[in-house]
């Protein structure tokens, strides 16, 4: 069933962006269902919307790329067994969509760690040696990010990172059809929202 009130042409543009390997940035006012839309797109394309990064002032690069199991790291040194993959690592390894919520709330230096993954489609793991030190993204990997227009200026994205994304504005629904409450069940058995075009 249809979940989001949005122009079909906008959805088509989003799908074209993702199909061509470009990152997708959904921007708009709070409450315009950007997160739900990114979840639906990720599920439709990858069959999985669980690879999600929640942006914030305390978000670190380890939470985005990878971390370490320190017990294994101390006992055996850096290895693929000791590496703990974060959403970005998992998405590149498995060829899936990664969702980055509220990216403009994330510190600039953390945002810019996405540059190599979006342009060269490769993540370097300097702690490892040989082939394990380079993770190349499988086909299907991409990033859908969201940003609130109210957060503009909090952590403004660099020009280099902006060039890696296609921006799509998600607009609020301008108005709902007027309806007398006592007639709601008769006029719209599915509720007032059932009368609105959705996709």
What is each model feature region?
Residues 1-197:
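AAA+ P-loop NTPase catalytic core and its hallmark functional loops
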């Amino acid at each position: 069933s249809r979940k989001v009130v949005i122009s079909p042409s906008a959805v088509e543009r989003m799908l074209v962006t993702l199909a061509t390997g470009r990152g997708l940035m959904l921007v708009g006012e709070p409450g315009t269902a950007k997160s739900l839309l990114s979840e639906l797109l990720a599920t439709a394309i990858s069959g999985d919307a669980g690879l999600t990064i929640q942006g914030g002032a305390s978000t670190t690069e380890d939470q985005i790329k990878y971390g370490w199991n320190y017990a294994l790291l101390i006992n055996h040194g850096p290895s693929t067994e000791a590496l703990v993959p974060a959403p970005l690592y998992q998405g590149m390894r498995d060829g899936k969509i990664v969702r980055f919520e509220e990216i403009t709330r994330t510190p600039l230096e953390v945002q810019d760690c996405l540059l190599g993954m979006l342009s060269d489609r490769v993540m370097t793991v300097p702690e490892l040696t040989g082939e394990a030190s380079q993770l190349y993204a499988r086909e299907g990997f991409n990033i859908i990010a969201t940003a609130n227009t109210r957060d503009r200026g909090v952590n403004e994205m660099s020009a280099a990172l902006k060039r890696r994304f296609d921006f799509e504005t998600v607009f609020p629904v301008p108005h709902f059809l007027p309806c007398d409450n006592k007639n709601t069940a008769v006029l719209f058995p599915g509720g007032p929202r059932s009368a609105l075009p959705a996709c």
